[in-house]
């Protein structure tokens, strides 16, 4: 018989102490008031306005994309309204040499990282040109397999380190993605090799229709970073300043050789999971939606800038009209893009085409010429 222990190891106490360390970081409250002066980022007035312009522009893009999808002019589309601060403020903290590995809802980040809007529309339509990013756009195509981008990001970040680049790789997934095995494998590899990576979990409370409460017993998703020995932080994802500052500091750590960081942004998607038949009213209440609408990242940031005399209705209307004009031009260009063919796809696959495919190529070439 084993000897009776004289004292107990209180595992629950250790867990509670660990979880208590992950308090949500916030700089702006819902009314746009600064609640933590020490954390306010060092952004110029011009930069603050530029970030707001991008958020407004992206909200219009979301509205138009939903409309275009319903008209049959866009294919797959995952709405972004509500997540603008989480997406765009984090991207704003990056440099052009940094790599973005987006999920399927993260097209706005790569647009602002240099991807032409027309190409984003072509990606939605399944046109191969939508995956041929222009030279200098350091990003990969949006990942459809949930969580897979975390492994890829670890590899890209490790490659940047091996090449001595002063750059980072950043990726995004949702709360549901943090339950995937690829999530752990990615952050563990990056941790082990101190790869310059930033792993963003955009916690919008639902993995499609599965609520956050049924996905994990962890009090926060940021604390999952502890398992691989790297920092994790939870921020108010509706607060552009908090998201920006958290990402900026994570980037500084990464390029200094201190390894990756996990950032959990508490956010919300106002629309459906995707435009492929999801109905959020079946799993969300109108009261819940109303509570999160009070936290709208655009409203909050708008109030902050108005109080500083940097924003007004005329300025916003100007951005809205510019967005509509640019979106109209981009979708027209996408409409006029030459229809893809089997041979045009094969042309970009091989430098020297294998004999068996070369024979098939000639067959399709003849068919397409008729």
Curated annotation (Swiss-Prot):
Domain of life (superkingdom): Bacteria
GO biological process: branched-chain amino acid catabolic process
Keyword hit for Oxidoreductase: yes
InterPro entries: Alpha-ketoacid_DH_E1_comp, DH_E1, PdhA/BkdA, THDP-binding
Cofactor(s) this protein cannot do without: thiamine diphosphate
EC top class named in words: oxidoreductase
EC number: 1.2.4.1
GO molecular function: pyruvate dehydrogenase (acetyl-transferring) activity
Reaction catalysed by this enzyme: N(6)-[(R)-lipoyl]-L-lysyl-[protein] + pyruvate + H(+) = N(6)-[(R)-S(8)-acetyldihydrolipoyl]-L-lysyl-[protein] + CO2
Keywords, comma-separated and alphabetical: Oxidoreductase, Pyruvate, Thiamine pyrophosphate
One Pfam family from the record: E1_dh
Subunit note: Heterodimer of an alpha and a beta chain.
Function: The pyruvate dehydrogenase complex catalyzes the overall conversion of pyruvate to acetyl-CoA and CO(2). It contains multiple copies of three enzymatic components: pyruvate dehydrogenase (E1), dihydrolipoamide acetyltransferase (E2) and lipoamide dehydrogenase (E3).
Name of this chain's protein: Pyruvate dehydrogenase E1 component subunit alpha
Origin species: Staphylococcus epidermidis (strain ATCC 35984 / DSM 28319 / BCRC 17069 / CCUG 31568 / BM 3577 / RP62A)
């Amino acid at each position: 018989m084993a000897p009776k222990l004289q004292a107990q190891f209180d595992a629950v106490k250790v867990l509670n102490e660990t979880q208590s360390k992950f308090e949500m970081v916030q700089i702006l409250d819902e009314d746009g008031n600064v609640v933590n002066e020490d954390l306010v980022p060092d952004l110029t007035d011009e930069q603050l306005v530029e970030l707001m312009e991008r958020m407004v522009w992206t909200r219009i893009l979301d509205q138009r994309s939903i409309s275009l999808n319903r008209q049959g002019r866009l294919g797959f589309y995952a709405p972004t309204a509500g997540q603008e601060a989480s997406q765009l403020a984090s991207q704003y903290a990056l440099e052009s040499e940094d790599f973005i590995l987006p999920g399927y809802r993260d097209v706005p980040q790569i647009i602002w990282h240099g991807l032409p809007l027309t190409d984003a529309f072509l990606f939605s339509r399944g046109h191969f040109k939508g995956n041929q990013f222009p030279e200098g756009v350091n990003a990969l195509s949006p990942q459809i397999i949930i969580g897979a981008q975390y492994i890829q990001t670890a590899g890209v970040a490790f490659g940047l380190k091996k090449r001595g680049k002063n750059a980072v790789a950043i990726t995004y997934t949702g709360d549901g993605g943090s339950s995937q095995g690829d999530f752990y494998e990615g952050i563990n590899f990056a941790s082990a090799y101190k790869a310059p990576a930033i792993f963003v979990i955009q916690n919008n409370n639902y993995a499609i229709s599965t609520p956050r409460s049924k996905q994990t017993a962890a009090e926060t998703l940021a604390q999952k970073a502890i398992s691989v020995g790297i920092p994790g932080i939870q921020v108010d994802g509706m607060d552009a300043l908090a998201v920006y500052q958290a990402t900026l500091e994570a980037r500084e750590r990464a390029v200094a050789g201190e390894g990756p960081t996990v950032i959990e942004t508490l956010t919300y998607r106002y629309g459906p999971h995707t435009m492929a038949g999801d109905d959020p009213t079946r799993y969300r209440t109108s009261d819940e939606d109303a509570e999160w609408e009070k936290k709208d990242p655009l409203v909050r940031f708008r109030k902050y800038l108005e109080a500083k005399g940097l924003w007004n209705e005329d300025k916003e209307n100007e951005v809205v009209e510019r967005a509509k004009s640019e979106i109209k031009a981009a979708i027209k260009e996408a409409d006029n893009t030459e229809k893809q063919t089997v041979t045009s796809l094969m042309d970009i696959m091989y430098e020297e085409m294998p004999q068996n495919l070369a024979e098939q190529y000639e067959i399709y070439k003849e068919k397409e010429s008729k």
